[in-house]
Every structure is written in structure tokens, then in C-alpha cells.
Swiss-Prot record:
InterPro entries: Homeodomain-like_sf, Myb_dom, MYB_TF, SANT/Myb. The keyword DNA-binding applies. This is Myb-like transcriptional regulator mfmK. PROSITE patterns: HTH_MYB (PS51294). It comes from Annulohypoxylon moriforme. The lineage of its organism: Eukaryota, Fungi, Dikarya, Ascomycota, Pezizomycotina. The keyword Transcription regulation applies. It is found in: Nucleus. SMART domains: SANT (SM00717).
Length: 462
């Protein structure tokens, strides 16, 4: 068991100095076993080190110079490991200093190469076996290492292991324990007001179409509230108390600072009741009427006369305007002509593109198309629009009552269904007329309205 190191006291130093002086005065050599008997509790080794390292006069302290190293190497070659004679040959160092400096620095058998993992493992195993008895460990360590080198290497390995353990413990605690200020996040419903890009680029203020996006949890309640509000608005708009007419409420010409931006606000009530008495008697309002219900009282005009006259148009003021390059619906007969009695004239407007997708052929003409129930003037009761067997007529031309009417032949029987796609550009006034006419059909219509400037889509379900 290793002894506990104790500091030398002043009394112990006095006793050691007195014993050394007595031996020197009598001319006796310094026998440290005999001198240690004069200092209770101290060994011969303790007394020798204390004398030569601290109390002896003329002993050099600190690093060795090159001349001292050369004298030490020569003395060891001559006297071996007799450190007393080596110390006398050196003259500036005591025997302990000579022994320590030779074994730790100048011994040619010392290994100064890098430590390998196997050598580290052998050192740790030796410490487990011999504790910190570095003299015993150095005697059996391969390759040869000094006691100081073994001690320093063990201190380095222990410090490295402690740092790794602390780092792993810190990481484990950070994973297992959440931060003190940690709060679980919850989904919060927000009302986000969407502003179309047209407002930014055009600089005309708020856009008339505001889309309110809400969370899924509030959609059901909001739908009920919106239905109630729309029912109240429809009661005010009807005025006459007729519950069968579910006409849409359309606001046109929203403006900022008195400038009409051509936007449309549409409020539609989802109802299956037909809005027009002319169509109420039909069992299938969405089915197109057969050919027999359209009029055939117009004269034939060759197709070439329409295709070549790029400046001829038909002025239509109630529904919409068609311009050169439009597609219209007509029958395809062998003569290459269509039935029409429309008078047309030239006018200027913004080009549009209307594509009526159906099984019947298309001809490119410069005119407008109108579909509305015909009046009962000059007709018998059997052909009146309000009867079950007579659907409304299709008219091509202006809104005058004297305009000839043209029918479209080639359609199938009354029970057939058709899917019609229309692509057009219109103004606010034209949009109001279009929405009124479509709402009166009493069928489900999906309409996609885009803002022309920035292509911002808005879908309305009628």
C-alpha cells in the first residue's frame, strides 16, 4: 500500500540538516539509512531527495543544458548506474537528478513512437492489475516506456473517457427530457383573406372578389350560417313572395373611386326549383329540346359569304357579343349553307372566343347567338312556350321582335342530354345578362370565371 505523502516541516528540515553536518564533520560518507534514523517518520529515500533537491548547497535546479547532458552520458558510460559517482562527475546535479534525467530523457532504450490502440489496452489492463505502481508497470510494458510516459498516457486516456461519458450523458438527457419552455403546438384555425393578384398589378384598390378560407372544423357551421343569410337576401330580392323563382343576386361594376373594374359578385342559392315558367313544365330541364320546336322561316345564305366578310357582325345587346373568328352552332347540310334570316352590320368590340362543344358541326361566322323563350305572338296555343310539348325557341339576331328566327336541325329526340362548354370574354353588363339567362334554365351549371388581367381563377357553382 502506498504511503501518504507529507510535506516536510521546518523541524524535520532542521533534524536532517544537523545529521548531514555531523556526518560531514566526522568525515563519514552520507549513509542515508543511518541519517534517516535521525528524522522520525522519514525513510532513507525521503531524506536523500529532500537533501539533494532542497537543502544541499551548490545544486542546479531547472532544465538541463547540453553540456550537462554530455557529461551525464559520459559518466554513465564510465560508472554505469552508480549515481553517487555520476553526480560527483557532473558536479552540478545530485544523484537523484542524474538518475531521473537519464531514465526519462537520455536513455537510448526509451520508445518515443506514437501510442497504438493495442498499447493503450495493455496499459489500462496493467493499471487494473498493478494500480498506479508505475515502476512495476514500466518493467513489463512492451515496447519500453518510461514511468513518466506511462503515467501521462494513462491520464490522457482517463480524461478522454470522462469527456465522452459526459457528452453521451448530455445527449441522452436532452433526448429524454424536453426543454422547460417546450409547449405542444396545436392547430389554430385562421381566417385568411385572399386578395387576387389583379389588385397588386393594376393598382385599382381592393378586388371585388374576396375568398375567405377557413379551417375544416368550422366549415359545417359556416355553411349553415351562409345558407340562412342567403335565404334572407333572396326573400328581399323576390319581393313578390314567389318562392319558385330562385334568381341569382348579381352585383356588377364594383368600382373604386368611381372607376368600374368589370368584376362580378355572384350570390346563388342552391335550389332545384326552376326559375322560368317557360321551362317549368318540362320533366327534364337539362335536356335540349328536339329539332321540331325550332323555327325554319329563314332563307339560305351561303357559307362563303359569311366566311369572306370579316367585317360583318350582328349587333346583340341583351345577352353577349360575338366577334370575328367565333364558333357558332348550326346544322350541316349538303348544300353548304345555313338557315338564317339575320341582318347584320359592322361594329367594333373586343375579340372573344366562344366554343360550343357538341356533336353538331361548327361554322365560323361573324354574328351573335341568343337563346331565349319565344313570344306567343302569332302562334296557336299548342305551340306556346308554356305548354308541356313546346319548349322555348332559339333565336339568332338582334333583340327586335321582328327579327326572323332560325332553327337548328339535326338534334336528337327530347330525352337526349348534351354537355355544352362556352369560353368567352365579356363585360360586367354582359355577365349580368348571361347569369340571369343561365339561372333561369333550372339545371346544375358549373361556371369558371377568371379575372382577365392576372388569370386568377374563381369557380362558382350555380
Amino acid at each position: 500500500m502506498a504511503r501518504l505523502r507529507r510535506r516536510w516541516t521546518a523541524e524535520e528540515d532542521t533534524l536532517l540538516r544537523r545529521a548531514v553536518e555531523n556526518a560531514t564533520t566526522q568525515g563519514r560518507p552520507l549513509l542515508w539509512r543511518d541519517l534517516a534514523k535521525s528524522v522520525p517518520g522519514r525513510s532513507n529515500k525521503d531524506c536523500r531527495r529532500r537533501w539533494w533537491n532542497s537543502l544541499a548547497d551548490g545544486t542546479t535546479k531547472g532544465p538541463w543544458c547540453e553540456e550537462e547532458d554530455e557529461r551525464l552520458i559520459e559518466a554513465v558510460r564510465k560508472y554505469g548506474t552508480n549515481w553517487s559517482r555520476v553526480s560527483r562527475a557532473i558536479r552540478s546535479r545530485n544523484p537523484d537528478q542524474c538518475s531521473s534525467h537519464w531514465s526519462q530523457v537520455l536513455d537510448p532504450g526509451i520508445n518515443y513512437c506514437d501510442w497504438t490502440p493495442e498499447e493503450d489496452a495493455n496499459l489500462l489492463h496493467a493499471v487494473l492489475t498493478h494500480s498506479t505502481n508505475w515502476a512495476t508497470i514500466a518493467a513489463s510494458h512492451v515496447p519500453p516506456r518510461t514511468r513518466l510516459a506511462l503515467k501521462n498516457r494513462y491520464s490522457t486516456l482517463r480524461l478522454k473517457h470522462e469527456n465522452e461519458s459526459k457528452r453521451e450523458s448530455t445527449i441522452r438527457k436532452s433526448v429524454e427530457t424536453p426543454p422547460s419552455n417546450f409547449e405542444p403546438t396545436m392547430a389554430i384555425s385562421k381566417d385568411v383573406k385572399w386578395t387576387p393578384p389583379a389588385q397588386i398589378h393594376q393598382g385599382r384598390g381592393p378586388d371585388p372578389v374576396d375568398v375567405l378560407i377557413e379551417s375544416d372544423e368550422e366549415e359545417d357551421d359556416d355553411d349553415d350560417d351562409e345558407d340562412n343569410e342567403e335565404d334572407d337576401g333572396d326573400d328581399e330580392n323576390r319581393g313578390d313572395g314567389n318562392s319558385k323563382n330562385s334568381m341569382p343576386h348579381i352585383e356588377l361594376g364594383n368600382s373604386l373611386n368611381g372607376v368600374d373594374n368589370g368584376a362580378v359578385d355572384i350570390q346563388m342559392q342552391d335550389t332545384g326549383v326552376t326559375a322560368s315558367n317557360d321551362w317549368a313544365d318540362f320533366t327534364e330541364p337539362s335536356a335540349l329540346p328536339p329539332l321540331d320546336y325550332f323555327h325554319h322561316d329563314a332563307q339560305h345564305i351561303p357559307m362563303d359569304s359569311w366566311a369572306n366578310d370579316t367585317e360583318s357582325h350582328v349587333q346583340y345587346e341583351d345577352l353577349l357579343e360575338l366577334t370575328p373568328g367565333e364558333n357558332y352552332l348550326c346544322d350541316m347540310d349538303d348544300s353548304g349553307a345555313m338557315n338564317t334570316g339575320v341582318q347584320y352590320k359592322s361594329y367594333g368590340s373586343t375579340p372573344t372566343n366562344i366554343d360550343l362543344s357538341n356533336p353538331i358541326g361548327f361554322h365560323e361566322l361573324h354574328r351573335t347567338v341568343e337563346i331565349f323563350p319565344s313570344t306567343t305572338t302569332g302562334m296557336d296555343s299548342s305551340s306556346a312556350p308554356g305548354s308541356r310539348d313546346t319548349p322555348p325557341s332559339m333565336h339568332f339576331g338582334t333583340s327586335a321582335s321582328t327579327t326572323p328566327r332560325t332553327s337548328i336541325s339535326g338534334w336528337s329526340h327530347q330525352s337526349a342530354h348534351y354537355q355544352v362548354c362556352v369560353n368567352m370574354i365579356c363585360t360586367g353588363a354582359q355577365m349580368e345578362s348571361l347569369m340571369t339567362g343561365l339561372a333561369s334554365l333550372g339545371t346544375c351549371i358549373t361556371m369558371k370565371i377568371d379575372i382577365k388581367e392576372d388569370k386568377a381563377p374563381l369557380e362558382n357553382q350555380l
